[in-house]
């Protein structure tokens, strides 16, 4: 129980400190409960039950529907577990790097393919910088081969086979582990390449966002007819367009849930960001 209390305190402190630094300096810190909830009491390992947002609180949901916020909270939860374990075993915690950015490929001398990228520093964690990188390479529609370790922020593929599309992902690594993978880039050389001009494809779309917010008098909600937002990767949570924007609309039953009610036309869909 004492370990649970320590883990809960570390987790709450980490989340609140990070959210105050990145989103709202007045983010409220609530009390920690010590209750006999079986999910946290019965397992013979430290555990906490985390309640961060309320779906009935419009201000909370403006954060909760933002994929950037969700990533940051998830990282805070991971960091708190790293802090807890480090304290238990008496070592200095090192936090895994953030995913790299600005991934690109280019042809260089003698038909070699160069992949380069930039590290992303974490302003909240001074020791989260990458010490090295793992480059993953796949051919055509095949799976990724085991990664190749490099110290610099570039990698050169020497042997290029004509007619094959090479796909790349990169992850940063340090003593704390491996970052989440980067986006994927690809390049290939068609047969008879000396007669074919080089074509460069630029991925100019890197936006992720919550849906548009509607606040006008007593009308509040998420106006996806103006901006649906963009998921980070894939989204399983979006079930359909909101149709009840009246904040005074009461809950009657599950078929008439009142303010915030939405259609369920997309319940089975996985949306790509």
Segments (PLM) and residue ranges:
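Active-site-adjacent substrate-binding region
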Residues: 2-34
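Short beta-strand elements bearing conserved aromatic residues within extracellular beta-rich modules
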Residues: 131-135
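Short beta-strand segments within Ig-like beta-sandwich modules, predominantly Fibronectin type-III
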Residues: 145-152
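Beta-strand-rich modules
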Residues: 156-179
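Aromatic-Pro/Gly-enriched surface loop or interdomain linker
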Residues: 184-273
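Active-site-proximal beta-strand/loop segments in catalytic clefts of secreted hydrolases
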Residues: 1, 10-15, 35, 51-58, ...
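Active-site-adjacent mobile loop/cap segments within catalytic or ligand-binding domains
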Residues: 24-91
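Pro/Thr/Ser/Gly-rich low-complexity, intrinsically disordered linker/stalk tracts
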Residues: 83-127, 162, 176-197
